[in-house]
Amino acid sequence: MIQMQSILEVADNSGAKKVMCIKVLGGSHHMVAKLGDVIVVSIKEAIPGGKVKKGDVYKGVIVRTKTGVVRADGSTIKFDKNALVLLNKQDEPIGTRVFGPVTRELRAKKYVRIMSLAEEVL
């Protein structure tokens, strides 16, 4: 579960390395974000020559969390780190590649494009 001030890694090739959550979208009672939720982030660490730079504010969809997700069959999928994919104003991925695995739960949230860019879908 991701809340304000949480530090996440970026799972795409947009040029950002680490971001900080500054707002969880989804209404006033939406205090934490889970897998597939959209949050507003600030870039804290970026590589030179990337598409984004430090201090920029973007939206991002969460693709991996430490708390994981429980599926209907009872299985649980957890990851070592929290990660997200940066989105532009039209809610499309900024990067052209997604590193690491993503879960099938993104399909229900209408992020099929991220699933097609990912290396592995669990």
Curated annotation (Swiss-Prot):
Species name: Rickettsia bellii (strain OSU 85-389)
Annotated SUPFAM superfamilies: Ribosomal protein L14
Family membership: Belongs to the universal ribosomal protein uL14 family.
GO CC terms: cytosolic large ribosomal subunit
Coiled-coil spans in chain: none
The protein's name in its UniProt record: Large ribosomal subunit protein uL14
HAMAP family in UniProt: Ribosomal_uL14
GO biological process terms, semicolon-separated: translation
Pfam families: Ribosomal_L14
Entry-linked PROSITE patterns: RIBOSOMAL_L14
Described function: Binds to 23S rRNA. Forms part of two intersubunit bridges in the 70S ribosome.
Gene3D superfamilies associated with the record: Ribosomal protein L14
Keywords assigned: Ribonucleoprotein, Ribosomal protein, RNA-binding, rRNA-binding
GO molecular function (one): large ribosomal subunit rRNA binding
Quaternary structure note: Part of the 50S ribosomal subunit. Forms a cluster with proteins L3 and L19. In the 70S ribosome, L14 and L19 interact and together make contacts with the 16S rRNA in bridges B5 and B8.
UniProt xrefs under SMART domains: Ribosomal_L14 (SM01374)
